[in-house]
UniProtKB/Swiss-Prot annotation:
Biological process according to GO: protein glycosylation
Record membrane topology: Multi-pass membrane protein
Role of this protein: Specific component of the STT3A-containing form of the oligosaccharyl transferase (OST) complex that catalyzes the initial transfer of a defined glycan (Glc(3)Man(9)GlcNAc(2) in eukaryotes) from the lipid carrier dolichol-pyrophosphate to an asparagine residue within an Asn-X-Ser/Thr consensus motif in nascent polypeptide chains, the first step in protein N-glycosylation. N-glycosylation occurs cotranslationally and the complex associates with the Sec61 complex at the channel-forming translocon complex that mediates protein translocation across the endoplasmic reticulum (ER).
Keyword check for Membrane: yes
TM annotation in the entry: 33-53, 84-104, 118-138
Keyword Transmembrane: yes
Oligomer and partners: Specific component of the STT3A-containing form of the oligosaccharyltransferase (OST) complex.
Extracellular-side positions: 54-83, 139-149
Top-rank lineage group of the source organism: Eukaryota
Pfam families per the UniProt record, alphabetical: OST3_OST6
Entry protein name: Oligosaccharyltransferase complex subunit OSTC
Natural source organism: Gallus gallus
Functional pathway: Protein modification; protein glycosylation
Stored PANTHER family: OLIGOSACCHARYLTRANSFERASE COMPLEX SUBUNIT OSTC
Length: 149
């Protein structure tokens, strides 16, 4: 294998180039990187790739017993399909739960006053629990009868 990789370099000669970093390029701050990670997590869990490829409608419609069309946000009985609003709502909940865990982690810093620590713990627990139970509600709307019993 080594010979196979050495073969092109026996024929070609590498140029003597000295590259240096441009002056305007600098290391991003930790908060900028964190914001990019959270935004990309939001978009990926929201199914942005699926939305670009399949181009589903933002919301669907369903005919009720009187023959009227009413909007629905969840594509029921289809695990591998979604409306755009369904993906964004689920993505918001996943992101809120993840941020709740990060808030819970930040509440353990040693220099935080007691009231702020309590508020961080409360907000963290509420966001984690709310996102968990709302995700269960979304699953019940997506697959009726799935989480029963």
């Amino acid at each position: 294998m080594e010979t196979l990789f050495r073969l092109p370099f026996a024929v070609l000669e590498c140029p003597n180039i000295k590259l240096k970093r441009p002056g305007w390029v600098h290391m991003p701050s930790a908060m900028t990187v964190y914001a990019l990670v959270v935004v990309s997590y939001f978009l990926i869990t929201g199914g942005i790739i699926y939305d670009v490829i399949v181009e589903p409608p933002s919301v669907g419609s369903m005919t009720d017993e009187h023959g009227h069309q009413r909007p629905v946000a969840f594509l029921a009985y289809r695990v591998n399909g979604q409306y755009i609003m369904e993906g964004l709502a689920s993505s918001f909940l996943f992101t809120m739960g993840g941020l709740g865990f990060i808030i819970l982690d930040r509440s353990n810093a040693p220099n935080i006053p007691k009231l702020n620590r309590f508020l961080l713990l409360f907000i963290g627990f509420v966001s984690v629990l709310l996102s968990f139970f709302m995700a269960r509600v979304f699953m019940r709307m997506k697959l009726p009868g799935y989480l029963m019993g």
